[in-house]
Amino acid sequence: MLSTPVTSQLRLKEFQDVYEPAEDTFALLDALEKDAKKLRQMAEMKNLLTAEIGCGSGCASSFLKSGILKNKPIVHFMSDISNSACRASKITALNNRELYKDDNGLFITVQTSFLDGIRLGNGVDILIFNPPYVPTEFEEIPSEAATIASAWAGGTDGMDVTSTLLNQLKDILSQDGVFYMVAVARNKLHSICEILQKDGFIVNETLKRKAGRETLSILRIYRIGNTIWDE
């Protein structure tokens, strides 16, 4: 079992608006570790381009890049609308490269919405996303990037932010790529499946876990015909 990345810098006041690793984060880490063998198999086949959207603390990014895919020649992008989150993620990446003894590959942090402005085309091989999934009134979705609410307020059915990415996924993920996303039961998982199936994707619920009043699901999503992930 891999160690959880260290994110001790989040105790500093300058990072008070950065979402700290919580049950949803740990569920995502467990899902990634569950698939570690296949993820490493992907890295043996080619130099991967990987990314996390809404990187927050950078915990999941460091776990994937420096933990599971340690010493692989990977370029990993971390994006967030929050400047504080981008800075926190960069520190997490640097600190945990030493922890995991990861001496290869590259972390790139970009302050942006989704992957806007980063010309990756259909080039992302592994994509991870722990979206703001809590159902809220639309007015509760913050317009300011530096608010902690931007990490959890998901609007109607908790799907406002997620739906935007799902509609872009076919233009982001590589042919043999895989996408891991956190969701909760209130997000209407059947609707997520319907949206993605129309675009030629297969959706697997790879992990399910209770967290307080929520039921967390980690979805593994890939294109039809992806021979690595077809089960």
Curated annotation (Swiss-Prot):
<feature type="binding site">
    <location>
        <begin position="130"/>
        <end position="133"/>
    </location>
    <ligand>
        <name>substrate</name>
    </ligand>
</feature>
<keyword id="KW-0489">Methyltransferase</keyword>
<keyword id="KW-0949">S-adenosyl-L-methionine</keyword>
<dbReference type="InterPro" id="IPR002052">
    <property type="entry name" value="DNA_methylase_N6_adenine_CS"/>
</dbReference>
<dbReference type="GO" id="GO:0034605">
    <property type="term" value="P:cellular response to heat"/>
</dbReference>
<dbReference type="GO" id="GO:0005634">
    <property type="term" value="C:nucleus"/>
</dbReference>
<dbReference type="GO" id="GO:0102559">
    <property type="term" value="F:protein-(glutamine-N5) methyltransferase activity"/>
</dbReference>
<keyword id="KW-0963">Cytoplasm</keyword>
<comment type="subunit">
    <text>Heterodimer of mtq2-trm112. mtq2 is the catalytic subunit carrying the catalytic and the S-adenosyl L-methionine binding sites.</text>
</comment>
<dbReference type="GO" id="GO:0003676">
    <property type="term" value="F:nucleic acid binding"/>
</dbReference>
<keyword id="KW-0808">Transferase</keyword>
<dbReference type="GO" id="GO:0032259">
    <property type="term" value="P:methylation"/>
</dbReference>
<protein>
    <recommendedName>
        <fullName>eRF1 methyltransferase catalytic subunit mtq2</fullName>
        <ecNumber>2.1.1.297</ecNumber>
    </recommendedName>
</protein>
<comment type="function">
    <text>Methylates eRF1 on 'Gln-182' using S-adenosyl L-methionine as methyl donor. eRF1 needs to be complexed to eRF3 in its GTP-bound form to be efficiently methylated.</text>
</comment>
<dbReference type="InterPro" id="IPR029063">
    <property type="entry name" value="SAM-dependent_MTases_sf"/>
</dbReference>
<feature type="binding site">
    <location>
        <position position="130"/>
    </location>
    <ligand>
        <name>S-adenosyl-L-methionine</name>
    </ligand>
</feature>
<dbReference type="GO" id="GO:0035657">
    <property type="term" value="C:eRF1 methyltransferase complex"/>
</dbReference>
<dbReference type="GO" id="GO:0036009">
    <property type="term" value="F:protein-glutamine N-methyltransferase activity"/>
</dbReference>
<keyword id="KW-0539">Nucleus</keyword>
<feature type="binding site">
    <location>
        <begin position="54"/>
        <end position="58"/>
    </location>
    <ligand>
        <name>S-adenosyl-L-methionine</name>
    </ligand>
</feature>
<dbReference type="GO" id="GO:0005829">
    <property type="term" value="C:cytosol"/>
</dbReference>
<dbReference type="GO" id="GO:0008757">
    <property type="term" value="F:S-adenosylmethionine-dependent methyltransferase activity"/>
</dbReference>
<dbReference type="GO" id="GO:0002184">
    <property type="term" value="P:cytoplasmic translational termination"/>
</dbReference>
<comment type="similarity">
    <text>Belongs to the eukaryotic/archaeal PrmC-related family.</text>
</comment>
<dbReference type="GO" id="GO:0008276">
    <property type="term" value="F:protein methyltransferase activity"/>
</dbReference>
<dbReference type="InterPro" id="IPR052190">
    <property type="entry name" value="Euk-Arch_PrmC-MTase"/>
</dbReference>
<feature type="binding site">
    <location>
        <position position="80"/>
    </location>
    <ligand>
        <name>S-adenosyl-L-methionine</name>
    </ligand>
</feature>
